[in-house]
Structures are given as C-alpha cells and as structure tokens.
A protein has these predicted regions:
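Residues in the short beta-alpha loop(s) of Rossmann-like NAD(P)-binding domains
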Residues: 20, 45, 139, 216, ...
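Beta-strand->loop->alpha-helix junctions that form or flank phosphate-binding loops
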Residues: 43, 59-60, 92-97, 228-241, ...
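Phosphate-binding loop of NTP-binding sites
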Residues: 28-32, 63-69, 76-214, 218-228, ...
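Nucleotide phosphate-binding/pyrophosphate-handling subdomain across enzymes
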Residues: 3-13, 23-29, 33, 251-355
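Short, basic phosphate-binding NTP loop
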Residues: 1-108, 129, 286, 292, ...
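Short internal beta-strands
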Residues: 40-44, 211-213, 332-333, 355-362
Length: 394
C-alpha cells in the first residue's frame, strides 16, 4: 500500500506541520521509504532531530512558511484559518492520505460524543468475527502506523473534527453519532465545526454507507440530496422493533445510559452492513470493559463511589452521565470557556437529581453563580481549585 503514497510524496516538496505524535509518525514513514528526501518540519515549539535532510521552522512564526510547499501534512488541532493558503498548496493530513491511498474498506466514526465508545465497540465486534482489523485515529494511534497492512484489513478509524477538517476522501462506512456545539473557538463558530464533521460523508460514493443519528437528523446540517451513498438512519426506537437489538443494548452492565445504548445500535448497524452475524455482534459488545475517563468507576471510599467522567466536555454529555448513574450525590464541573451557551445546562442542573454541585474555574464559577441567582435549591460550592475540595465538606 505504501507505494502509491510514496510516489505521491516523492516529487513534491513536503512540510510536516506540527511535530507531536502524528507528526513524528509522518516523519518516520517518509524517512523509511525516502531516506534522502528533503523534509521540512514546522512547529510552535522547539524540535530536536538529527537529520541532515530536515529543515526546521520553529517558534511563533512557524505558520509563515506554509505557502512555500506543495504538500502540507497538518497535525490535528492546529488551526490554519488565519493563513491565506495559495491555490497550488495542498493542505492534507494523515487521515486523508490513508483513506486516499490505503486501498482498503475503512469504517470511519465521528460525532461530538460517543465516537470513542462506538469505535471501540465496532472494533471489538470485528475482532470477535475473526476479521483482521485495527483501532486507529483519534483513539491515540496515528493511522500511518497501520499503513503497511491496510490492504489486508478493515480498520476502524475514530475521527475527530480536526482530523476531518482537511480530509477530502470519505470512508466506505461512515458513522455520525451526533452533532452538538463544541470546539467553537477553533472553527470560529458552529457552522465551521459541522462542515468539518460532514467530510465523513461528503465524498462517499454510491456503493458506500452512511449511518447517522435519525433522532437528531441531518437535514439541518446538509442537503440530503448531496449524499450519494446509502443512508441508514438509526433511532433509539429501533431497539424496540428488533428482538436481538432490544436484548443487545442491555447485555453489558458497563454500558449504562441511553447514550451508550445508542452507541451499541450504531456499532451493530455498521457490523451488519459488513454482513457480520448477530452472534459475533453480541460477543463483541459483551467483551467491552470500559474506556478511561468515560463514566469510569475509579473506586469507593467511605461508602462513596467515585466516577471519572472528565471526557464529558459538553453539557449534553454531563447530563447523560447524571441520568445513567441515577443518584449522584456530588457533581464537579468546570473547565475552559470554549464559547458554549450554558443556559439550558443551568436549567437542567437545577432540576436534576444531584445534591451538591461543586464549581471550579472558569466555566464552573459562572454556572454556579447563575444557579445561585436563579434560586436553585442545590448546594452550590464555588471552589478555587481541586486542592480546596479536600478541605470542603458539602
């Protein structure tokens, strides 16, 4: 599979934009197959590398060199919205190059929330069915690390909006779990964020499959006539119509809550689209043993059970966890302000079954003060930092 990609890069000037985990992975691949090729690396932070054929551009002005190259392989999370990119410059990423040159049928999964769980469940189902697969992408494994075996496998790729932003090739099976406002600071608004997410389906062909959340719908985000692939809308009600699915969504006690049940439905639908038998779907779901930071039971102390749900960075995810766990004594909230509207979240918190709401900077303080102003009967604790909580008794 390497050859088409290597041929593409061989005759073009290449800039690796960002030298984190994915950038280093890109460098290793190019250097392995093109040992003498001149490579340029740009990063805001210092880069140390012993390679006579590498040019480094580091520091605050690292973005200024983008238009000096034919191909820019960008790391996720680096925003180039303030750079006027010339027409002869191709800004791409590992994900796009993998989908374009990989020569395999990929399952790509994205969404504001649920993509990691859905990706993991899908991967476990494929493994249970004896299919050669890999779980790669936003889950923490750069896609280039599976490049060598791509033609012989069906990889499951977790795709963030950052990875999709410059992806112009869509996977054979694309799954969109949901879309809620997030990363608005990066995309300068909700529209830009949604446009990035929709690259998962935008370039699919007639023989491809797009699985989406029918309860939320997609018509407000994209003209459905633009979608060339087969569309499969999944609703929570589907579990009631199918005896197997009805039993499946409750077969694993680690997958609590309606959001996890929906992730199961999406993964099962993707597996069925590949022709996988129900017995393997069930085996895969049953083998799931949880994901760190997602309603993770971290232990019990003095009769109090603690859950780490720190991946819940939007209000909808927080409320799903509160609903799934039933009786929550204390909820700790806070984090950076990314420009989200918290008005509905404040109302939901005021009416939910939580006794104590502990508010950390910076969003937590604003939410806590709003709850106090509206006369909420919750015990609102405004804390300076986590250390202060050790000396605070609700």
């Amino acid at each position: 599979m390497f050859q088409p990609l290597i041929d593409y890069l061989r005759e073009r000037s290449v800039l690796i934009l960002g030298f984190g985990r994915e950038g280093r992975s890109t460098y290793r691949l190019i250097r392995e197959f093109l040992p003498e090729k001149e490579i340029s690396i740009a990063d805001k932070f210092p880069v140390t590398i012993e390679d006579k054929n590498v040019n480094l551009f580091c520091g605050d002005g690292y973005m200024s060199v983008i238009n000096d190259f034919e191909v820019v392989i960008k790391s996720p999370g680096i925003s180039v919205r303030d750079v006027e990119i010339k027409e002869n410059v191709t800004v791409t990423c590992q994900t796009d190059l993998f989908l374009k040159f990989g020569g395999c049928k990929c399952i790509g999964i994205t969404g504001t929330k649920g993509k990691t769980t859905t990706s993991t469940l899908t991967y476990l189902i494929l493994k249970a069915a004896g299919i050669n697969t890999a779980l790669i992408g936003n889950i923490g494994v750069p896609v280039f690390e599976s490049l060598g075996n791509a033609e012989k496998m069906i990889p499951v790729i977790e795709l963030s909006s950052h990875q999709l932003e410059f992806t112009r090739t869509s996977p054979h099976i694309g799954v969109l779990t949901n879309v809620y406002p997030e990363h608005l600071d990066h995309y300068n608004g909700f529209k830009g964020y949604v446009n990035a997410k929709l690259n998962i389906v935008r370039n699919q062909k007639e023989n491809d499959i797009f699985i989406y959340n029918a309860d939320q719908g997609i018509s407000e985000f994209i003209d459905e006539s633009e979608i060339k692939s087969k569309k499969i809308g999944i609703s929570a009600e589907d579990a009631e119509k199918d005896p197997f699915l009805k039993e499946l969504v409750s077969c694993n006690p680690r997958l609590l809550g309606r959001h996890n049940r929906f992730d199961i439905l999406l993964a099962a639908t993707a597996a069925r689209a590949l022709g996988i038998e129900d017995k393997f779907i069930r085996a895969g779901i049953e083998s799931f043993d949880g994901i760190p930071h997602r309603m993770e039971n971290v232990g019990t102390y003095k009769g109090i059970t603690f859950y780490n749900d720190s991946i819940a960075t939007i209000p909808e995810a927080v409320m799903c966890a509160v609903e799934a766990l039933k009786k929550v004594g204390s909820l700790i909230i806070g984090g950076n302000d990314r420009g989200l509207d918290y008005s509905d979240f404040i109302k939901d918190l005021s009416g939910c079954n939580v006794d104590n709401i502990i508010c950390l900077p910076e969003t937590g303080h604003a939410i806590g003060n709003s709850l106090k102003e509206m006369g909420s009967d919750k015990n609102i604790i405004i804390a300076k930092d986590m250390d202060c909580l050790l000396y605070t008794s609700p």
